[in-house]
Amino acid sequence: MAFWSLDSNGSRVALLAESGATLTYAELARLADGLAAHLPDGPVRTVGFLLFGRNFDAVALYLGALRSGRHVPLLLPPGIHPAALADLVAKYQPDWIATGTGPQSACPAGYSQQHQTDGIAVHWRCESSPVVEPREPLGLLLSTSGSTGSQKLVRLSYQAIDSNSRAIVQYLRLNEEDRAISTLELSYSFGMSILNSHLAAGASVVLTDQTLLSRDFWELAQKSHITSLSGVPSQFAMLRRAGLERRGMSSLRMLTQAGGNLSEPLKREFKTLSDRIGCEFYCMYGQTEAAPRISYVPPARLDAKLGSIGVAIPGGSLDLDTTTSELIYRGPNVMLGYAENRADLAGDDEMRGVLRTGDIGRRDEEGFFYLTGRLKRFIKLSGARVNLDDVEKLLADAFDAQLGCIGADERLSVVLVESSAVTDVAIREFLRTRCDIYPGLVTIERRRELPYTANGKLDYPALTRLML
């Protein structure tokens, strides 16, 4: 049964809140179906936006949409910038939008509220919905770059998200006694996969907005007896500062890391720490296009394979393009394809289970894979994939400036011509408020002129050399 079936685990606890409230699997199933009943009921399947807060009602609506087989949600962060949300609404014309209920949770114009709970408010489109119906087996939509509000979406089938959750259960050896805590946004594919896999195992998840540097987080984690702690590279840097070992987390049995490359010194440090406190440390690789997990390093091999992304997850396989060395993944969790507007949601399976990752790699003699570069202009910032072209366009449009964006994981570099009037402060503030990019990850440089290719396009390799 799919992880959203829920019913088979009955009286077991599925979700826990900061308040101490709990929800069993049976209660979650009833709540999910009840909330889904407040979505538009008609002869065709619908598309909706779920601003995915970390609360019972938002999780229940997500599961209710999956259980219905009729409603396809796009998962979005609850704090998405209004301009980014408006752009997405214009492109995809959702039939419904589910927001939070706080003062910052206003719904775009053209929608009327139909139902509200403590955690969510459901709004329906006022005008007649578009005739384009999302085609089965499409079950879920995710943004390719949530922080910039990219309008390019990943189309995932029901099989993709369920098979990936089952594979994660298998290699992490999750069971009914496991308990995770929400250290990541649930709209982010890594955060979503933690929720999905624990539900697939009949385990439980503690929902909180607290951060790893918060005393309340650690008090909640301790009293909830969590068994796993997950994060992206920037969060593992926080975890180092927070001092995991002195937190007395005796119930902890695993640490899991994804969302970008963790530096080798930090990998060594956390491998040594995990051995000392008696838990396992999993370093993993994935992409939203694979729902999202692709590979992992077995903890027992991490010391010997420190720079590796590991081996393919159960049910999947990895290979290299013989010409370009691009990493190619095959598996049932590969997306159906991309979408850039409402009409694309009626598209067929364009990928046929094959994903060209855009990463360049190599394979060692034992079959472990390593990344050596990228074909595409993407970086990871605080675990979120950022499209450099999107950021560059947003900045150029906002400030009417001649500029270019380059970078590496955990570092975005903005290069402007010296004559640009825009200030560094204005750029950092724009990136913080519009793209949710932490100012400390941004480097701003000015040059007399920017390099261009013969056909008039910005020369990114030359720009990168300028920054060395």
What role is predicted for each listed range?
Residues 379, 406, 429-468:
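Conserved C-terminal "lid"/linker of ANL adenylate-forming enzymes
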Residues 11-42, 53-55, 83-86, 156-159:
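Conserved AMP-binding/adenylate-forming core of the ANL superfamily
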Residues 226-231, 240-303, 317:
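Gly/Ser/Thr-rich phosphate-binding loop
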Residues 326-389, 397:
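Conserved ATP-binding/catalytic segment of the ANL
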Residues 37-79, 183-184, 385:
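Conserved AMP-binding/adenylate-forming
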